[in-house]
């Protein structure tokens, strides 16, 4: 069956998933028996910002221990110990932009003068909200996943596919990534072909099947297209290149990984248009500081220099990337 942590996605994606009968796997449960939520994970562990790799490094800086002392030194200086081969200028070091904003936790130890924010940073949200719960679901039902990863996406996903291939058989993990060899253009073409089938009668067949299985209510309105509204429509440029008129990529609505590289209107700007109530909550109310005051993504985006005010769309000078931001 199709399985997804759909509750993390945009509502238009959730609607399409429901129309296709995709199983929504809930998040992990906390020790008190309640489920982890976006707000609870962010409040306890920190904001997912910049990238998973960098967020993980900042989280180490924010949680110093004797055990991670050598790693923290490498994050600030690039110098590794014996385990890292005594390297200088290693890739462990944060680039200058992020060192300046997040390296202040080690000022006393390293004799530096960097800043530090008054909010937490972490990459743990993925684990608590989608990774571990989907893994547990697979083990419980003796199933292994087909993942929609593509090497063309780059980053950690491409690295994982290069290391492990399309089909991975490990000691405790088995998974297949059949889309690995395809590119974005292939997926957009497939989406158009599937949408034609949907409009040519597949929608009615799914509706009838899911009603019979008791997985849909009589009042549920099937979407006219299986291309979620958040993407807009799929159009073709003069050179034949396919593109989506709205969002280019989506994921968890509160994720900030890569936000500093997006031109405006970015993902939070689009959320403001589609769901202003959720946008307001994420921007200003999802966390509380030590004094009990609400805050959210607006504070984080201000700190890293990314615009978020809807009235300023059309320019985002503070958040523009420069060549040095890609070094290391």
Give the residues covered by each predicted segment.
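ATP/NTP-dependent adenylation/nucleotidyl-transfer catalytic domains that generate, transfer
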Residues: 184-199, 203-328
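ATP-dependent adenylation/nucleotidyltransferase module used to activate substrates
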Residues: 1-186, 193
């Amino acid at each position: 069956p199709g399985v997804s942590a759909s509750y993390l996605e945009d509502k238009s994606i959730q609607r399409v998933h429901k129309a296709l009968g995709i199983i929504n796997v809930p998040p992990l449960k906390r020790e008190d028996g309640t489920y982890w939520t976006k707000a609870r994970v962010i409040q306890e562990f920190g904001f997912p910002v910049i990238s998973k790799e960098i967020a993980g490094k900042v989280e180490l800086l924010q949680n110093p221990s004797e055990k991670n002392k050598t790693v923290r030194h490498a994050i600030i200086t690039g110098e590794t110990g014996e385990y890292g081969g005594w390297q200088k200028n290693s890739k462990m070091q944060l680039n200058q932009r992020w060192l300046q904003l997040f390296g202040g936790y080690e000022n006393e130890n390293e004799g530096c003068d960097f800043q530090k924010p008054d909010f937490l940073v972490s990459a743990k949200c993925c684990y608590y909200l989608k990774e571990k719960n989907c893994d547990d679901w697979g083990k419980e039902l003796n199933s292994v996943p087909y993942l929609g990863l593509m090497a063309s996406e780059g980053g950690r996903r491409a690295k994982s596919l290069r290391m492990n291939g399309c089909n991975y058989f490990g000691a405790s993990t088995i998974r297949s990534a059949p889309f690995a060899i395809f590119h974005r253009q292939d997926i957009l073409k497939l989406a158009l072909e599937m949408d034609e089938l949907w409009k040519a009668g597949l929608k009615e067949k799914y509706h009838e099947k899911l009603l019979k299985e008791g997985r849909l209510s009589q009042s549920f309105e099937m979407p006219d297209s299986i291309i979620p509204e958040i993407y807009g429509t799929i159009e073709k440029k003069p050179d034949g290149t396919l593109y989506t008129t709205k969002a280019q990529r989506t994921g968890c609505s509160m994720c900030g990984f890569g936000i500093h590289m997006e031109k405006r209107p970015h993902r939070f700007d689009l959320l403001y248009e589609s769901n202003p109530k959720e946008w307001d909550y994420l921007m200003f109310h999802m966390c509380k500081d030590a004094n009990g005051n609400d805050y959210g993504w607006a504070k984080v985006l201000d700190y890293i220099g990314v615009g978020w005010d809807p009235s300023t769309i059309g320019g985002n000078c503070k958040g523009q990337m420069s060549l040095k931001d890609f070094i290391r």
